[in-house]
């Protein structure tokens, strides 16, 4: 696995340093991951990083295009070692995230979730207007506790006004419910797939160690970079369209 490919998304050196190539024990593998496995060493499967590079490039292009088209990406990583990276990278790229337990119906029953989000927004607005000062101290504390509780569950999706254009998952083996909801709604799924995963339900599988914190942060960071690229493209397009509209208006007014 020599680094013969120059590519702007990620290098083999970066993947190696993050431990992306380390899979699970050979006895814990999913045979469907065979095409993504390079070899095994001391009872551990070693992921083919050339395929990781290619897969990540495809996922990167897809995410950038989805965001450039006005969509949002929902990052999902509820296991402990994924939570911080998922929260940080989704926030950095102005995307959505879930790091606590996946709430059933979050996507498939989004109308109900939207009502809960509106309730949270209303509570925070009341607090910001000073309305909590107009109720008893006990009632104010109860309302503050409700805000904290709702933010713990919904904090990463507070700005979600419609269904996401894509989902990025850290560990499909753990996030089966989230993936199931996305598939029912036709939402494309990008995911890190370790050697114990089933890649079949994933639209853009990225073969990778999904347990090592450095590997998770690297991949989440690249998907966040793709989202930022998409945002920049969208903003540039809006600027060009606005300039064209102003030029057209100027020419019309001149006649």
From Swiss-Prot:
| UniProt cross-references to SUPFAM superfamilies, sorted A to Z | Ribosomal protein S2
Mention one GO molecular function.
structural constituent of ribosome
GO annotation terms (biological process)? translation
Q: Does the keyword Cell division apply?
A: no
Database matches in InterPro entries: Ribosomal_uS2, Ribosomal_uS2_bac/mit/plastid, Ribosomal_uS2_CS, Ribosomal_uS2_flav_dom_sf
Is Nucleotide-binding given among the entry's keywords? no
Question: Which GO CC terms are listed, alphabetically?
Answer: cytosolic small ribosomal subunit
Q: Which UniProt keywords apply?
A: Ribonucleoprotein, Ribosomal protein
Domain of life, per the record? Bacteria
Q: Which PANTHER family match?
A: 30S RIBOSOMAL PROTEIN S2 PROKARYOTIC AND ORGANELLAR, SMALL RIBOSOMAL SUBUNIT PROTEIN US2M
Q: Which family does it belong to?
A: Belongs to the universal ribosomal protein uS2 family.
NCBIfam families assigned to the protein according to its UniProt record, in alphabetical order: rpsB_bact
Name listed for the protein in its UniProt record: Small ribosomal subunit protein uS2
